Structure formats: C-alpha cells, structure tokens
C-alpha cells in the first residue's frame, strides 16, 4: 500500500541552501524512501528569483524522482503554506556590509511575522516547522509567536549544524569514527555563543571527556572552532556554508519525523522551563525523538563552566528577543 503524499514547503527555494536540499528531499532522504512528497516552493516576488526557481524545478523534473508527487512555485506564503505537513524556512535576509544586528533583526522580523501568520492561517495543525534562516532561534521565536493557534512545540530552530560540526571535531581529535560518538549535546543559540558539550559523550561506551582530558583544548580550541566554523568557511570559500546547512536540516527533520532510536541529537525548541531556561525561549537542547515528537534529555548535571556557557548564550538570546518584542 503506497503512502499518501505529504506536503513540504521550502522557502528561499532558489537560494544556495534550497538548491542543496530540494533534490535530497525529493529522493526520500528526509522522510523515507517510501514517502511521496509534494514540494510547495516559496521565493520572493521578484522576477529574477521566480525565474531561478523555475530553473530549479526543471532540474527536479529531469531527475524523474519516483517520490516527487508534485511541485508548485509560489511568491505568497498564504498559498505556499496551504495544508503543509512540513515547513523548512530557509529564506532570510543575510547581514549586509555595515548592517547593524538590530537592522537585521527588524528586516527578518517582518519576514518571519508574515510567515508565522500564514502558517497559522493555512498550514496543517500538525505542521513541523524548522527555521534555518539566521538568526535562526530568534526567527523561529518570531514565527512561533505569530502563530498562536498552532502548538508552540511545532516550531524549531536548527542547531544540528553546530551539533554535526562538534561531532566531526571530536572524531578528528580522538581519531575515532564520527558514527560511534553518542550523547553529544549543544546548548543555546545558533551563533558563536552556542555551547557544544561533550561531558556525557561516549565512543563505544568510553567517555570522550576522559579520552581527551584537556579542558584547555575544550575552552580555547574546540568551542571557538565549532562556534566560528561558519566564518571560517566564508573566509575559505567566499560564500557561506550551504551544503552542510542543507545536510543538517535533512538530519533534523528526518530525526524529528522518523525518530532517533534513543540517540541524542540537538534541536532548538521552545523551552518548557528545563534547566532553568525561561519558558518559550527558543533554545538548543539535547533531545531524543520518537513517534514524531521530541523530548528533552532530563536531569543532566550542569557544572560551573557549563553553567557559565549556558548563561552567556541565554543572555544573547534574551537580548535578541527583546530586540524583536516590538514586532510581536
């Protein structure tokens, strides 16, 4: 019995991350090799962007993906989000030269207020929303606050790129396979203040912290490397990381939809008060996923260094939220 197609909205669909993600969604990498999808693609109402989107759709057609049950181009979120089961909000305004962070928050505030309202009006009531466009946590917070009729838990922000970056640094440091690392956690904001925490991590049952046993490396090499990896990629390639961001978005959605089999992953989610994080703050937590729901890993001890890191990233998030309060 073949499954009924699900509707997947992708914003910024003709952008770099969009180009890196759409073919993987259509091939079944995100929702499973037995799940047909209808792609509802949103781009800005500018002729050049809409034309580029048509080109991407031509390529998608030319792949003849068996699971691609349909696709549509849109310039209005009210039509793009109609009845969607999954929404990947990738499109956002990047920070231009000389642009203040407050300006960036205001411009994106307008985009994500409109998209949150559209999801509220027309999306499936069980829609799973992932915000990739930066500042991801605050954009997700804005969308969530603009959609009062949808459960807050349906809105998430992407911390998986930080999580995957941390895994690869640990694999490289220990000389072990990245797939063998379990129980990695990333706390906080998707920004250089995020706190990648391997205190609980294991490789084949052995403690990674004991294996590395170097707090100086943790504080002065590991955390800055993971936190500033995006900037390092821009410096090397001249453009921001798109393929790795697309890959992290696929990982995030796949795990949320299909489950993690008890493995820890990191998701930016509205806090329910866990670990002293104020309610509704869009914050990275270690979670496990099962049956289409995520659950925060509870009762982890937080030492003084970790608390300091968590407080720092929380303060940044609270400042960002305060900066958009007037838009909500």
Swiss-Prot record:
GO terms for biological process: malate metabolic process; tricarboxylic acid cycle. It holds the Pfam family Ldh_1_C. SUPFAM superfamilies: LDH C-terminal domain-like, NAD(P)-binding Rossmann-fold domains. Coiled coil: none annotated. It catalyses: (S)-malate + NAD(+) = oxaloacetate + NADH + H(+). GO terms for molecular function: L-malate dehydrogenase (NAD+) activity. Transmembrane segments: none annotated. Keywords: NAD, Oxidoreductase, Tricarboxylic acid cycle. The active site is at 190 (proton acceptor). InterPro entries: L-lactate/malate_DH (IPR001557), Lactate/malate_DH_C (IPR022383), Lactate/malate_DH_N (IPR001236), Lactate_DH/Glyco_Ohase_4_C (IPR015955), Malate_DH_type2 (IPR010945), NAD(P)-bd_dom_sf (IPR036291). NCBIfam families: MalateDH-SF1, PRK05442.1. Catalyzes the reversible oxidation of malate to oxaloacetate. Belongs to the LDH/MDH superfamily. MDH type 2 family. This is Malate dehydrogenase 1. It comes from Albidiferax ferrireducens (strain ATCC BAA-621 / DSM 15236 / T118) (Rhodoferax ferrireducens). The lineage of its organism: Bacteria, Pseudomonadati, Pseudomonadota, Betaproteobacteria, Burkholderiales. The gene is mdh1.
């Amino acid at each position: 019995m073949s499954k009924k197609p699900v509707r997947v909205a992708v914003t910024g669909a003709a952008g770099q991350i969009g180009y890196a993600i759409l073919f993987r969604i259509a091939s079944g990498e995100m929702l499973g090799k037995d799940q047909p999808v209808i792609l509802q693609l949103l781009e800005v109402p500018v002729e050049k962007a809409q034309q580029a989107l048509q080109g991407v759709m031509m390529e998608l057609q030319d792949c003849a993906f068996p699971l691609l049950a349909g696709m549509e181009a849109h310039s209005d979120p009210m039509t793009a989000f109609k009845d969607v089961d999954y929404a990947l909000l990738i499109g956002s305004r990047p920070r231009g030269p000389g642009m203040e962070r407050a300006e960036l928050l205001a411009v994106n505030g307008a985009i994500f207020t409109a998209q949150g309202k559209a999801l509220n009006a027309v999306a499936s009531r069980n829609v799973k929303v992932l915000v990739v466009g930066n500042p991801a946590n605050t954009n997700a917070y804005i969308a969530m606050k603009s959609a009062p009729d949808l459960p807050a838990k349906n809105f998430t922000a992407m911390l998986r790129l930080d999580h995957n970056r941390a895994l690869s640094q640990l694999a490289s440091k220990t000389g072990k396979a990245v797939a063998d690392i379990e129980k990695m956690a990333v706390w906080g904001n998707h920004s250089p203040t995020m706190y990648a925490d391997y205190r609980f991590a294991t490789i084949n049952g052995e403690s990674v912290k004991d294996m590395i046993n170097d707090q100086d490396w943790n504080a002065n090499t590991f955390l800055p490397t993971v936190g500033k990896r995006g900037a390092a990629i821009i410096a090397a390639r001249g453009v921001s990381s798109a393929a790795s961001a697309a890959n992290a978005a696929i990982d995030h959605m796949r795990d949320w939809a299909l489950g993690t089999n008890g493995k820890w992953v990191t998701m930016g989610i509205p806090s329910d008060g866990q670990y002293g994080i104020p309610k509704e703050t869009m914050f990275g937590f270690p979670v496990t996923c099962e049956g289409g729901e995520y659950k925060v890993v509870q009762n982890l001890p937080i030492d003084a260094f970790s608390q300091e890191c968590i407080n720092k990233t929380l303060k940044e998030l609270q400042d960002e939220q305060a900066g958009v309060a007037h838009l909500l």
